[in-house]
């Protein structure tokens, strides 16, 4: 079963896009920059937990791009 946010967004796909953004940056390093635990980032990347709006903003500020792409895959 695909996990989804209330908006209908697919958590597995969101997690994959966040992992893609992270690239070669270690989870622990990025988590510290974002102000979350490594475990929380791991859950988000595995689609077990959805990102907060605050986290989406921080990811866009850190890597560029858009929150739309993170949430929907549309550029």
Predicted features and spans:
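Short amphipathic recognition helices of helix-turn-helix/homeodomain-type DNA-binding modules
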Residues: 2, 69-75
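Amphipathic, hydrophobic secondary-structure cores in small proteins
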Residues: 47, 51-52, 70
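DNA major-groove recognition helix of helix-turn-helix/homeodomain DNA-binding modules
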Residues: 54-69
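A short, Lys/Arg-rich alpha-helix, primarily the initiator
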Residues: 1-25
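Residues within the helices of the helix-turn-helix
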Residues: 19, 28, 57
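Residue-level detection of the helix-turn-helix DNA-binding "recognition helix"
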Residues: 46-48, 57, 61, 75
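Short alpha-helical DNA-recognition segment
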Residues: 23-46
